[in-house]
Every structure is written in C-alpha cells, then in structure tokens.
Amino acid sequence: MTRRWELDALRGLMLVLMTVTHLPTRLSSPLGQPFGFVSAAEGFVLLSAYMAGLVYGGMARKRGIEAMRTAFWRRALKVYACHGATLLFLFTVIAAVGVRIDQPAVKDLMSYYLTHPLPALVSGLLLVYKPALLDILPMYILFLLASPWVLVQGLRRGWTALMGMSVGLWMLAQFGLDMWVYDAAVRLTGLRVPFQETGAFSTFSWQFLWMLGLWMGASRTRPDPRPFIFPGWAVALALAVAVVCFVWRHWIGQAPFGANESLNLLFDKWRLAPLRLFNLFALMGLAIRFGPGLVARMPRLRALETLGAASLPVFCMQLVIVLLVLAFFGANPELHPVWLDMLLVIASFSALYAVARLALRLDRPADAKRAKAS
C-alpha cells in the first residue's frame, strides 16, 4: 500500500505534542491539550487504529485472513519487544540514577518496583504492572492481539454489532468496569499489584477509540468505499464545539472546571469521559470535512512525515529521553533555567529525528521484501 504522507505527518504531530507534554519544561503546560480538552494520546491511538484497519484490512482482502493475522501478531510482538526494552531501561538505568541522586520524580514514578522489584518485573512483562509513561504500549499490544478477530468479524458480518459492544464496554467503564475486572482478578489469581499501578488508562474505555479507528480504516478497503460526509448543520455544530472548547481550555486552563473534581470528571482523559469524546468528535468531523482540501493546498511537512513514518521507535525514544530528563533534572521545570528548557527541547527533537531517519533506513530492505511478496 502506498503511504499517505498526510497521515504520517499527522501522526508525527501527535508525537511532537506528546514529547512536549511529557518533557518537564515550561512548555509542557501551555502546549498540553493545545486544541481543546483533547490530548495527543487520543489522536495517536485513533490514527494508529485507522492505519491498522487500512493496512491489515486491505491485506486480508488481497492476501487472505491468515496473512493478516500473522502480520498483526508480528506487529504485536515487535511492540512488546519495544515495551520490554523500555521497561528494562526504567528498571535498570533510570532506577540506578534516581536512587543514587535521590530523585523524587523517579522514585515516585517507580515506587512499586523499588519496594517489590521481582513481582514488579514479572508483572510488568506480563502487562499487568504499568508505570506512568509506560502504560500506553501495553494497551496498544492488547488491541493488536484482539484486532485480527475483530477485523475478521467486521469484514464478514459487518460492524454494527461490534461497535455496539464497544460502546457498551465504554459505558460500563464510566461506572468502574476496570475496577470490577481487577477485583475479580484479585479473587481468582491472588494478584498483588495495586490497582493504581495497573496503568492510568482505562482499557475498556480506550478500546472504543481503537474500534472506531479500526472500523474507519477497514471501511476504506472496500472496492467502492463511501466517503465520510456530514450535513452542514453537523459541521457547524462541530465548529462551534471546537471553538468553544479551544477558547475554554486556553482561558481557564487544562482543568475545565477548576477545583471542582466532580465536574472535571466529565472531561476525564483516562476514562474518555463523555464531554471529552464530544470535543474529540468535533475535531474529527472538522478534520474529515476540511482536511483533504487543506492537504491539497499545503506543502508536505517532511520532518513530521519522517517522525510519523517511524512512529514506534520515535515513541520509544521519547520515553527514553523523558525518563532521562526526569532522572537528572526532576519534574519541576521552575527549578532549572529557561535556557535549559530550550536546550532540552532542541536536543530531544534532534534525537527523535535522527532515530526516525535511522529506523526508516533500516526498514527499507524489509519493506522492499514485503512489497515484492505482495
């Protein structure tokens, strides 16, 4: 399949925003959630699912179900290897530095590992223990493992029932489905990893984004795919919601209702709360409606395109960079000078771009082999 540069560039933009948000600099707060009450994580997961549906759905139609299933499992294994490597990096290099210089940011981030090293290592490799910052790849791996079955059902029987089940799981997650499943696992297996150490993301909420993206991507592989068309009133509503949320976020801050935690939960990121999804759908609608025209008029964004085309190694590298910065400089940017912020940002993106170029160069022989096989 021919790569679509605009999708790579958009994924590259998500990686840039995630890096800026995670790096402990003075830019992280003003540039966090820059488009409203939606973060780069939502866009990255949705776009990754869309690409998976587009690529692997097309593979299933052209080369068969087994080829698609094998490719999904190979991708899941690759992501698992990357997650395992970053996890071991955290448990060795970052732990050693953090303990040696008594860095609170590191000791707080991996407190469970520091008190229970062996159970943390085993449960981390089993995708149960998920330290902060390292909790999105385990969710991604689970989605990849489930996707072959989902795609087969969607291609053979349609997506209505699948999306209905997905919405149902999302709704149950708003009322604590993750905790119910955790409690059941504790009773059945004697699991000792505390609930708060199993990752901030609600898997049962975020699966809805993955399912939505997977369906949208797979639908483009039909011989005569119907374009996504929205009526004028829906576009106007999406524009109004997007503008209101954009102004609201930059006027009030990232907590939409200030200190009112009960109302802030309506925009909760970790459970993909209803108002957050409303904001995300508004931005999606605008991107689908105006994106093609914008892409036709704008120049190619080569740097973002390069980052997005090598999204997995770039994502892992930004984790390594952020962990190193936390270990040596801490989590409070006010404790170091502004010039260090600028130096960290420039050095970080230089490293990410270099990793992306290297990864793409190393992948060329494999890409050529796959293209020849197809």
Task: For each feature predicted by the language model, list its residue ranges.
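Alpha-helical transmembrane segments and their immediate juxtamembrane cytosolic regions
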Residues: M1-S374
